[in-house]
Amino acid sequence: MNEEQRKASSVDVLAERDKKAEKDYSKYFEHVYQPPNLKEAKKRGKQEVRYNRDFQIDEKYRGMGNERTFLIKTYGCQMNAHDTEVIAGILEALGYQATTDINTADVILINTCAIRENAENKVFSEIGNLKHLKKERPDILIGVCGCMSQEESVVNKILKSYQNVDMIFGTHNIHHLPEILEEAYLSKAMVVEVWSKEGDVIENLPKVREGNIKAWVNIMYGCDKFCTYCIVPFTRGKERSRRPEDIIDEVRELAREGYKEITLLGQNVNSYGKDLQDIEYDLGDLLQAISKIAIPRVRFTTSHPWDFTDHMIDVISEGGNIVPHIHLPVQSGNNAVLKIMGRKYTRESYLDLVKRIKDRIPNVALTTDIIVGYPNESEEQFEETLTLYDEVGFEHAYTYLYSQRDGTPAAKMKDNVPLDVKKERLQRLNKKVGHYSQIAMSKYEGQTVTVLCEGSSKKDDQVLAGYTDKNKLVNFKAPKEMIGKLVEVRIDEAKQYSLNGSFVKEEEPEMVIQ
């Protein structure tokens, strides 16, 4: 949605709000730009998505942050981590300097996650903890951004109960941060600017990347799948793909800067290119193009089984810098549960996809996500998830108890699965996850593997740590000069979720920048 469309739609949004007194935020505060609306967020229009490659910060805002510092606390997924890099880039362009000391920061931003209730509770606790800081230093600015900001209930709760917050902005208008900051400095009221409809694709946004070894590369925004449990299609908007030439240019620049690994990001990367009306171009085509660039490792996340094509499998099977690790969320192994989840595939079709992947990529490492305790999940249905895990032999899984999200269809479903039953099932599933992880890890004992050394181990500063191409954590002793390099490590010990090894040598570079 471009600027003109946003202004026009905001009239309709505000008119709708006038009909509903319980959502009239103005009775609490003087000035609100635009509050979120989940009903509006669900609509998927055919408005043209504009590509803005000329983003510039107005000169009048430059210097706003001189002699001021900022701190960003980030919760949630890789997309949020990427957004934080952009927010930090904008703040530094305004003159702010990053700090790790929350007690001295002049601007504190909390980049939030809405995927599970636990994440939201942590954010509200964090906001509450900042109340005393606001009393001690009333001139600081406290802001809430990210996916939680796109939820009406969250914004309403902040407006009513957390008056230490100065500004709220969403996922679609990060590029408006200079204007939002200026308004927050000038206004006595809380500033809220949350676009319920997605915005243009803004290129050339400044970024402050976390480190110089690995980088996030966003390839698309939003999700149109509307799984019944998921709030993301509401908080991130409809699917919008970046132009391939813009992505490829960014990857080439990262190669020139010496990055060793990139991860292509999207809520559903497999849908990449479907909305590009002037060309036929999908994720397989993009991976093929990037495979010719001198980035040693290329990952992508997150994949939806529905959109995983044979073309993609073929490209990954060619090897090169596309790693043989595929994260393929299954969520459940029972067809009835998958149907009410709105996952658009069956147990049988998922297993068929796994077979096609394994046939063409024999050395592939498959990992997954699983939700336990979906509304009315029976013991028999849960056991089908366990048997599917056995059939696939996943090397790892991220497992979760079902978390109700207001505004999703699943929130209206009656749930008769007691919490203690859900926890017991999760425990059984995690036991299986650990079992198969140990099997996968044990195969590495005695082998020499290539590891991207990322830094010191979290548990021992004298030990270095990094990951294999299949995302296995490896701990080993080596000179600190190896940080940021690809090295060969002989595996001496396989633990359940990590490997211990001995440094052999630095790997020789093979690729040439295209």
Swiss-Prot record:
Where in this chain does the record put each Radical SAM core domain? 209-440
Chief location category = cytoplasm
Q: Which residues bind [4Fe-4S] cluster 1?
A: C77, C113, C147
Q: How does it assemble?
A: Monomer.
For the region Disordered, give the residue spans. Answer: 1-21
Q: Where is [4Fe-4S] cluster 2 annotated to bind?
A: C223, C227, C230
The gene behind this protein is: miaB
The answer to whether UniProt assigns keyword Heme to this entry is no
UniProt keyword list: 4Fe-4S, Cytoplasm, Iron, Iron-sulfur, Metal-binding, S-adenosyl-L-methionine, Transferase, tRNA processing
The reaction(s) this protein catalyses: N(6)-dimethylallyladenosine(37) in tRNA + (sulfur carrier)-SH + AH2 + 2 S-adenosyl-L-methionine = 2-methylsulfanyl-N(6)-dimethylallyladenosine(37) in tRNA + (sulfur carrier)-H + 5'-deoxyadenosine + L-methionine + A + S-adenosyl-L-homocysteine + 2 H(+)
**Can you say where in the cell this protein is located?**
Cytoplasm
Query: Mind telling me which PANTHER family this protein's record contains?
Result: CDK5 REGULATORY SUBUNIT-ASSOCIATED PROTEIN 1, MITOCHONDRIAL TRNA METHYLTHIOTRANSFERASE CDK5RAP1
Q: State the protein's name.
A: tRNA-2-methylthio-N(6)-dimethylallyladenosine synthase
Name the source's superkingdom. Bacteria
Query: Where is it found, in Gene Ontology cellular component terms?
Result: cytosol
Q: Which PROSITE patterns match?
A: MTTASE_N, MTTASE_RADICAL, RADICAL_SAM, TRAM
Q: Which residues form the MTTase N-terminal domain?
A: 68-186
Q: Which family does it belong to?
A: Belongs to the methylthiotransferase family. MiaB subfamily.
One Pfam entry for this protein is TRAM
What are the recorded GO MF terms, alphabetically?
4 iron, 4 sulfur cluster binding; metal ion binding; N6-isopentenyladenosine methylthiotransferase activity
